[in-house]
C-alpha cells in the first residue's frame, strides 16, 4: 500500500500523541459515527459503543479533553460532538486502519480498464477509470493529465510582426500546435533561425515536459553558446508552452452527482455548489492536483488544508500515475465530503493509479 503524507499539522510532541487508550477509543467512535451518519454523537451513545465500561459522565469528561485539544467540537444545534478537520487528519494519520481491496474489486477495476485501454484512446481509458472510481467511492473522481504525452518532432518560429512570432510545434504523430509568442525588442531573423536550430537539435523524440526541463536547466546554468537575444527567444518559447493557466493540462471529472447525495443542511448544498463552480472553471484544481506530481503514493487533503480553492468541508484523495518509462504523467483521485470512507477510498485510488500506470506502460 502506498503511503499517504501527513500535511504536518500534528507534531509528535503535542498532546495528541499522548492520548491514552480510553481517549483514543472514544475519539475513534466519534469519528466512525460521523463517517457513517454525518450526525453528531453524544456521550450516552458513545458509552454504549466503546469496548470498555464507562458511564456517560466519564465519557463527557474525556470528550471535554478532546475538545480542548481541538479534535472535536459541538455544533450549535446539538449536544453531540463532531470531529474537526484537525481531528479527521489525526484519525487518518494515526488511528485509521487502511484495508486492502477485495479480490473481486481488484479484478473488476483491472478487467474494465484493460479492455478499454486496448480498444480506445488514453483519454477514453482515463474517463472510464474515473467513472469506475466515482461509482465505487460515491464521490466525484478527477484526473489531471497532459493534453498529450506524444513525442515532439519539429519546431519552427514564424515572425508575424517585429515583436510577435508564431511558434509551430509538430509532434511525431502529426499533431500540430500553434502559439503566438511575444518577442523581445530588437530580435533579428537570424536569432529566430538560431533558436529553431538549437531547439530542434534537442526536442526531437522527447515529450514537452522532458524538453522543457532540459532546456530550462541548460539556460539556467548558461551551458549554451547562444547570444542573449537568442536565449531570450528560447526562454519566451518555453514560457509559451508552460501552460501556467492550465492550458496544457486536461482536467476530466466524473460523478458530480455523487456530491449531491446525503446532504444534511443548506450549508452542505452551498459547499457543493461552490465545489461544482470550481470544478467547472478549473480554478485551483489544476494547482492542487499538480502538487501530487512531485510525490509518490497517495496524498490526502482534508478540508481547509487545501487553500487553493473552496474545499472547506471537502476532502481530496489523489495519487500520481506514470507512463512506460516510469515518468509521472498525471494525477487521479476523488473529491468528496470530509466524511469520505477513507479506509476504503485510499486503497481504491492507489490501486486505480497503479492499474492506469500499468496500462500506459503497455
Curated annotation (Swiss-Prot):
InterPro entries: GAF-like_dom_sf, HrcA, HrcA_C, WH-like_DNA-bd_sf, WH_DNA-bd_sf, WHTH_transcript_rep_HrcA_IDD. Keywords: Repressor, Stress response, Transcription, Transcription regulation. Pfam families: HrcA. One of its GO terms (biological process) is negative regulation of DNA-templated transcription. One of its GO terms (molecular function) is DNA binding. Belongs to the HrcA family. Negative regulator of class I heat shock genes (grpE-dnaK-dnaJ and groELS operons). Prevents heat-shock induction of these operons. This is Heat-inducible transcription repressor HrcA.
Amino acid at each position: 500500500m502506498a503511503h499517504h503524507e501527513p500535511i504536518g499539522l500534528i507534531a509528535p510532541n503535542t498532546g495528541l500523541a499522548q492520548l491514552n487508550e480510553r481517549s483514543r477509543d472514544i475519539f475513534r467512535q466519534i469519528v466512525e459515527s460521523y463517517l457513517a451518519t454525518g450526525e453528531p454523537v453524544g456521550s450516552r451513545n458513545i458509552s454504549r459503543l466503546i469496548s470498555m465500561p464507562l458511564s456517560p459522565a466519564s465519557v463527557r469528561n474525556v470528550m471535554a479533553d478532546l475538545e480542548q485539544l481541538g479534535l472535536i467540537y459541538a455544533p450549535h444545534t446539538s449536544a453531540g460532538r463532531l470531529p474537526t478537520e484537525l481531528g479527521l487528519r489525526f484519525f487518518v494519520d494515526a488511528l485509521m486502519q487502511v484495508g486492502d481491496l477485495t479480490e473481486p474489486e481488484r479484478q473488476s477495476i483491472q478487467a474494465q480498464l484493460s479492455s478499454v485501454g486496448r480498444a480506445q484512446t488514453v483519454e477514453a481509458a482515463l474517463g472510464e477509470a474515473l467513472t469506475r472510481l466515482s461509482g465505487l467511492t460515491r464521490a466525484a473522481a478527477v484526473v489531471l493529465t497532459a493534453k498529450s504525452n506524444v513525442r515532439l518532432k519539429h519546431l519552427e518560429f514564424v515572425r508575424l510582426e517585429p515583436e510577435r512570432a508564431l511558434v509551430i510545434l509538430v509532434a511525431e504523430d502529426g499533431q500540430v500546435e500553434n502559439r503566438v509568442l511575444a518577442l523581445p525588442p530588437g530580435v533579428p531573423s537570424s536569432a529566430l533561425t538560431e533558436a529553431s536550430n538549437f531547439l530542434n537539435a534537442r526536442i526531437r523524440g522527447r515529450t514537452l515536459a522532458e524538453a522543457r526541463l532540459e532546456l530550462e536547466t541548460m539556460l539556467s546554468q548558461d551551458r549554451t553558446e547562444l547570444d542573449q537575444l537568442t536565449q531570450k527567444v528560447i526562454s519566451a518559447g518555453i514560457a509559451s508552452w508552460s501552460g501556467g493557466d492550465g492550458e496544457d493540462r486536461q482536467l476530466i471529472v466524473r460523478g458530480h452527482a455523487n456530491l449531491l447525495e446525503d446532504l444534511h443542511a443548506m450549508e452542505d448544498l452551498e459547499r457543493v455548489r461552490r465545489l461544482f463552480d470550481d470544478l467547472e472553471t478549473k480554478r485551483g484544481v489544476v494547482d492542487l492536483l499538480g502538487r501530487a506530481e512531485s510525490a509518490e503514493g497517495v496524498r490526502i487533503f482534508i478540508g481547509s488544508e487545501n487553500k487553493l480553492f473552496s474545499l472547506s468541508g471537502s476532502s481530496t484523495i489523489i495519487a500520481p500515475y506514470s507512463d512506460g518509462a516510469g515518468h509521472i504523467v498525471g494525477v487521479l483521485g476523488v473529491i468528496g465530503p470530509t466524511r469520505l470512507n477513507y479506509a476504503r477510498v485510499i486503497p481504491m485510488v492507489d490501486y486505480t493509479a497503479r492499474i492506469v500506470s500499468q496500462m500506459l506502460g503497455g
